[in-house]
Regions:
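C-terminal luminal/periplasmic domains and tails of membrane-associated envelope-modifying transferases
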Residues: 306, 419-664
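Polytopic membrane enzymes that build or remodel cell-surface glycoconjugates and lipids
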Residues: 2-483, 503-506, 510, 517
Length: 664
């Protein structure tokens, strides 16, 4: 039975609808983790000009250009990611179709009446399952990871254009391949090895002699070298070393487990990543979502004799050598299978460029390496009846699509993404599985921000137990305990955080707040004073914190009798916020305590006329008391109590003033 001419269009429509069904429910997902580059000015403040070449100029710049074209709305940016994903699927289909057309299958398969339709159906199923694979969600649904999706699109197009150039003999195709390669590298540096694929593609399509192979290899390596040299100018301080403070801290944790590891981090990272090649492949071939999250933490090898890592690394080398040998010695489906294996094996080399200890196993990077899987699947399935293939493909697509939809839902917000990641962390893993604290730390921060203090404290304690770096977990646990008014426990947590290396104005501020709440005003004043004097980052949030610190410093100065300091602080605050009632009350009380009651009343009277609040009446009562006007003081205190009947301080002060005045 001949295939209908409408079948390809029907398959395209089904695939597009299936992909949209997976990703459209996530269009309103919030920005997550690395997505913060989109909101903190990193991307929109530095990208958007093709004349100013930066890392990922094209992919990051596309956010700026798309916003200028379509306006604000993260859903528009997400929809563009989905469009890129569909573009990748189309490019993969075009590349593999061109390669399959060149491939001779066993004679008994080629003699089948449905051979061509079976081959096309097998490829369609392979591309469709790639499109719906839940592992792809971490590239497509994670907004800022557009870089790897765009790099994959141009890398595959470069390979396809090169193949078409070899098949047609037209130089324009080769020029297009070179342009697409440049665009791929400008999208993300992980595509740099795409040029190396020219050699296996040429060997597969032309079966050249050794002299020609050497010439093509030289040209391909020269192109890779040029691109690598450009990237070295950008990433030179990253290559072969631990490149950020968090990674350095994790390396020190490993050093504590086995002295000498820190000096061997680079070769151990190569060993680790070579073994993880198979873990990535496993998650794409058997995409069980229970093994997936944004923060996976496999053990880092402490030596070169680690059995699992050694077996994985030897397996990677054996697979690379075997695929190269098979490509050179075999034609037909075995040669194509070898070629498909060489795609991820060669692209994966960028994993060996630096020390991956902070993010050793992240699924979005694997999107590029997975594009050859549809080719391998097409080889296996070709020969089966097309009807059977479409039925099996539909069932598999429904299963994968459902799992992918669940992964999209897991990326809805910080709460879902870090809850999911925390669930996937093995708390009983060996201690060299460093970095496991991060999901719990971030989940605790999410709960703390929303006032779920018990949950936040619990997550912070788990993070601390799993080796959190620098005392962050202990500090945040202290903040959660402080908000629950468990101030002694909070102070113990702050002390533990400081012991683990946490420092800065925030630590002194929060410790002083708990001291103040416990009535230890001298310690509180010293804490606020230290926080004010300690330099911090120059940001809007830090500047706002400085205002809060100055106000609390003034409060503590007033409580400890440092009246000149209190007055100075309150006056400085009033220059910034002249109508701040709380600051006016503080200044009035400080002036009254200095005996400047006339000046104090000149603050309180218009304040009460404008905004008759309980603190204002209380402050004026203090001024009246210092002025010896007991009846007015008691009257204002009564008014303050009526406005805030639950305030124990007002009642205690009234009893004190009444006793000193000899009145009930």
């Amino acid at each position: 039975m001949a295939e209908s001419s409408k079948t390809p269009y029907l398959l395209i429509a089904v695939l597009v609808l299936a992909v949209l069904g997976v990703y459209l429910p996530g269009l309103r997902n919030e920005l997550l983790f690395d997505d913060m580059r989109l909101s903190d000015g990193t991307i929109f403040g530095q990208y958007g000009s093709l004349m100013d070449l930066r890392p990922r100029t094209l992919s990051y710049g596309s956010f700026v250009w798309l916003q200028k074209l379509l306006g604000d709305g993260w859903w528009k940016q997400r929809l563009f990611n989905v469009g890129l994903h569909l573009g990748v699927c189309a490019a993969v289909y075009a590349l593999l179709k061109a390669l399959l057309a060149h491939t001779r299958f066993p004679q008994d398969i080629e003699e089948q009446a449905h051979f061509t339709r079976s081959r096309d159906a097998a490829l369609c199923i392979g591309v469709g399952l790639f499109a719906l694979n839940p592992a792809a969600v971490y590239a497509v649904g994670y907004l800022v990871q557009r870089s790897i999706v765009m790099a994959t699109l141009f890398a595959v197009l470069a390979c396809w254009a090169f193949v078409r150039g070899l098949q047609t003999g037209r130089a324009a195709w080769h020029a297009g391949a070179l342009a697409c390669y440049a665009l791929a590298v400008l999208s993300k540096e992980h595509a740099v090895m795409t040029a190396a694929m020219a050699l296996p593609l040429y060997i597969y399509l032309r079966r050249p002699g050794w002299k020609t192979i050497a010439m093509v290899a030289t040209a391909a390596l020269l192109l890779v070298a040029v691109a690598a040299a450009v990237l070295h100018g950008i990433y030179g301080d990253v290559l072969g070393r631990v490149f950020d403070p968090r990674s350095a801290a994790l390396a020190q944790q490993l050093e504590a487990l086995r002295p000498g590891v820190a000096a061997r981090m680079y070769p151990l990272s190569i060993l680790n990543e070579a073994a993880l090649f198979f873990a990535y492949g496993l998650l794409w071939v058997f995409p069980y979502v229970g093994w997936m999250s944004v923060d996976l933490r496999p053990p880092f090898p402490l030596g070169f004799a680690s059995p699992w890592h050694l077996a994985g690394a030897l397996g990677y080398l054996a697979l690379l050598a075997g695929a190269a040998w098979m490509l050179l010695r075999r034609t037909g489906v075995l040669g194509l299978a070898a070629l498909c294996l060489l795609f991820p094996l060669l692209w994966y080399w960028t994993e060996f460029a630096t020390v991956w200890v902070q993010d050793p196993f992240v699924l979005y990077r694997s999107y590029l390496w997975a594009v050859a899987l549809p080719g391998l699947l097409a080889i296996v399935l070709t020969g089966f009846h097309p009807r059977t293939l479409y039925i099996v493909g539909a069932v598999a697509g429904l299963v994968l699509g459902g799992m992918a939809l669940e992964r999209v839902a897991s990326l809805r917000d910080d709460g879902t993404v870090w809850s999911d990641a925390a669930e996937k962390i093995n708390r009983d893993a060996p201690p060299n599985a460093v970095g496991r604290s991060r999901p719990f730390l971030n989940l605790g921060a999410y709960h703390l921000e929303r006032g779920a203090l018990d949950q936040a404290t619990r997550e912070f304690i788990i993070a601390d137990a799993l080796g959190d770096l620098g005392g962050n977990a202990r500090f945040n646990a202290g903040v959660a305990l402080q908000q629950q008014k468990q101030h002694e426990a909070a102070l113990q947590s702050f002390a533990a955080a400081q012991t683990k290396g946490f420092s800065g104005p925030l630590l002194h501020y929060h410790r002083a707040e708990s001291e103040f709440a416990l009535g230890r005003y001298e310690a509180a004043f010293n804490g606020f004073d230290t926080a004010l004097r300690e330099p911090g980052e120059d940001s809007e949030s830090i500047r706002r914190m400085q205002l809060t610190l100055r106000q609390r410093h003034a409060d503590a100065a007033l409580a400890t009798g440092r009246l000149d300091t209190a007055v100075s602080d309150f006056r400085a605050l009033l220059k910034i916020s002249p109508q701040n009632a709380r600051v006016q009350v503080g200044l009035g009380i400080a002036l009254a305590s200095q005996g400047k009651t006339t000046e104090a009343l000149a603050i309180f009277n218009p304040l009460i006329a404008r905004s008759p609040s309980a603190p204002a009446f209380y402050g004026r009562a203090v001024a009246y008391h210092h002025a010896g006007r007991a009846p007015e003081a008691l009257k204002d205190l009564d008014q303050a109590i009526r406005l805030e009947p639950g305030n124990a301080q007002y009642r205690a002060v009234r009893e004190q003033f009444a006793a000193s005045a000899g009145k009930p």
